[in-house]
């Protein structure tokens, strides 16, 4: 065999080996990733106590009072008006938030009255009696409490005011 035939045979063998390696390298590979999901029960909120400001006397002077009901059922007046708090039944609004322990949530709230005459109406920031606000404790139930406030002055119509505190709870 001459050198030329040897080189051609060697080149052919080399080319065949290269094509064979390329064919093997272009094959497919695969792997698997585990998948999981945790399905939770819906978060729930239930009212357990109404929001009751009790009775107040509007100021007779030209100044206003802010009526404040705190989360511990206490009504106070601030401002320079000469209004009064009358001894009467009062209560903060109470709600139970139910969800799996450790669930974090947020709330939105709105306080309104049907009758006109009260101004600067606002719910208080929610407080809790068990655990950190917005985190359901180990029991799976968190009580949240709301007070509220509004302004009155000598022009506020004397009447019974009715309304609602609407609270929405959302998973974080």
Task: Name what the model sees in each region.
Residues 15-20:
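N-terminal signal peptide c-region/cleavage motif recognized by signal peptidases
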Residues 24-106, 134-172:
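N-terminal small/polar-rich segments of proteins
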Residues 1-10:
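Bacterial N-terminal signal peptides that target proteins for export
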Residues 107-131:
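Surface-exposed binding patches on compact interaction domains or structured appendages
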